[in-house]
Structure formats: structure tokens, C-alpha cells
Amino acid sequence: MNKIKKSLQSINLKLFAALLVMGLCPTIYTTLKVFFLGQLPGDWSYSIAGQLSWVNLIYEIVSEAIILPLFFFMGSAILNKDDFSNKLKTGLIVSGGIYAVLSIGIILFTEPMLMFMAASPDIIKESATYIRIESVANVAGVLLNFALVALIAIGKDKLVYVFTALKLAFCVVTDTFLISALPFSLNLGVNGIGYSNIIVNTILTIIILMVLSKEGYLVRNKQKLSFAWCKDFFKIGSVSGLESFVRNIAYMLMVSRMVNVVGGSGVYWVANNFIWGWMLLPVLQLGELIKQEVSTDKNKVKTNTFGYFTITTFICILWVVTIPLYKPFMQYVLNYSDVDKLFHLVMILFVFYIAFAYQNIFDMTFYGRGKTNYMLFESVVTNSIYYGGFFIAYKTGLWIPSLDGIALMFGVGTLFDAIVSGIAYRYYLRRYMIPKSEKSLSS
């Protein structure tokens, strides 16, 4: 007990609280969008919005190859203002350019992609329009994320909190005018979400770039832009990008596509918003804390891990205690009509996300210590053995998908991945954290 207490005392709980507040903002405006969609007649709007989930996986692959390594490269250049300015300018060009090319490709091939992903023919036209709008918003979104990383790198952390709160405020205003059922709303439906994202991301990006310019990082000078640093950038980003590719492609084919096949994309999308937005909020923000703490000090892995496990256990107990509140929340806050179906789906996944919560400690330690090769190992093992086996079973007719069956498949896959992650974590501890003297005694 004393060991746990000491471990908790060494954790930056104030930063964890700040991260929780920061993470709460996007959760609130995502929930607001779900609420407004619930005011529209029928369930088709959820199904259309649900199609964006697999499109976002494509963007996530590129994002994890670009955004994750940025913290290292931007931070390493902070002592040299000219070098930092060059990386900021060229980084904006490269990331914006890559996202623009990707978005153009998605815009051109949206309908064939929707057909490949087995979307219902009734919503393909409307889904294609919405995805194209969101593709434009994603270009502004990556520029916003890049600019936020730059603010963190120059020590303007408090401004990041300010802009996160501003994003929430802007989203509430734009969603109210574009999506809501209020008399003065334009009633653009699901497309209003995309237009709202374009407006908010663009405005915030411009404001942050103005702040960076005022700080002297985006001023015009005669110095020629150098893209040489991008070689190392892509070298490091390729590992996290490859890991994300393996993980997300498997999810797209074995979960997102299968959910479309059984016609459950709408309820599955709302369930994911509830789980990832509310249940996993403290887990994911704890992960951000773990990344920050172990990246600066290797010994934090040894001193803080008991505390991380204690916090995670408390979060999981909180999930169980608040189960009676789930249905009222789904009905009155998410404004979802078929509450029983949504609750049933969430409860199927519930136990498996407890395993994910603990796996989060392992994976974020790997990210923080720069051991993304362990993450790649996990993805390859889980997706080739587990999901590969299910794919063969599906193709041979041994497994016939249903919404509950897909949820169980994904849930057990999450548990399988957590076990693989735990094995990799144990290997990491033995290799890097246990002194040689202790290893020789144990052997």
C-alpha cells in the first residue's frame, strides 16, 4: 500500500487534471453533434456520419506518421529560432501538402470506396457529399494540429488550453446555426458537421499562425527553406505510420466494413462516440500523461507504473458504479432513440475495454520511450493471427457476421491485443528496466 502511495505522489496529478479538462472539450462538442443529429427524422443521419469513421482511419494512418514524431523534431529545434522557424514553415507545407493530396484522392474516389466498404446504396450519394466536405476540413485540421504542436514546443502550453476552449465555443455556435432544429438554424443536417469543422479549423489555424508570427517564428526572411530534416522525420514516422496502417486496415476491413454489411453503422458509430468520448476519456488522457512523463525520465517507468495501474483501476470501478446512468445519458444527452439497442452494444464491449484500459499503460510507455517497434510487433501479431483467422472463417462461411458477433469479435480481439501488449511490455522491462545484477540472480 505504501508503494502505491509513493507511486501516486510521484505522478503529476495536476497535469492529469489539466489534460482531463482539455480532453473534455472535444468530447463535449462531439456529443453536441450527436445530440443535434438525434433531432433529425430517422436514423439515416447516424449511418451517414458513421461512414466517416473508416475514412478517418485513413487520415489517422498519415497523422500518426506525421504528428507523433513532431514533438521530437520541433522540441529539438527550439534553441535555434531560425531552425525552428524553418521546420515550422516547411512542416506546414509538407503536412498540408500530404493531406491535400490524400483529400483529393478521397474526394475523387469517394463513391467507389463507399461501395467497397459495403455502405447501403440508399445513403451512398449523401455519404459521399458529407465525406468530401470533411476531407476539406481534415486539411485545415492537420494544419491546426501542427500549429498546436508548435505552441507547445515554444512553451505556450496555456494558450493550447485557451484554443481548445475556443474550439468548443466556436463549435457550439456553428453547430447551433448549421445543424440544430432551432428556428434560425440553416438545417444543413449531417453536412453541417463538415462545414462547421471547416470554419472552426480554418479560423483557429489562422489565429494560431498569427500568434506564432507575433512571436517571430513566421516572419519573412531571406533564408531559403530547407526540407533536409524531413528525411529523418519520415524515417522515424514510418515506423508509427506502418504500425497504424496494419492496425487500421484490419479494423476497416474486419469491423467497419462488416458493420456496414449488417446495416449497423449508425448505432455502432454512436456507441463508439459514447465509449471513446466519455468512458475512455480519463484512460486516454492518462495515456497522454504517461507519454509525457516517461519520455523525459526513464526511471518514471519504475516509480510511476504502480500509480498508473491504481488510477486505471479506479477508472474501471467508476465505469461499473455509473452503469445505471448509461441509459439516461444515452436518452437525454446523446438524444438517441433506440436506447436499449445502444446500451446492449456498449455492454457487450464493456469488459473488453477494461483490458484496453490496462493495455493503454503498456502502449503509452512504448510511445513515450520511442519503442514504436513494440507497437508494430503487436499490430502484426494481432492482425495477422487473430483477425486473419476471422477473415478466413468469414470467407469459408464458418463465421456469419451479425452486429453482436462483430462486437464480440472486436472485443475478444482487443483482449488478444492486450495480452500480446502485456508480453511485449514484460520483455521491455526485462531488457531495459531490470538491472543486470537482478537478471543474473533471477536466472
What are the functions of these language-model segments?
Residues 47-104, 144-153, 268-324, 359-367, ...:
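Small-residue-rich hydrophobic transmembrane alpha-helices
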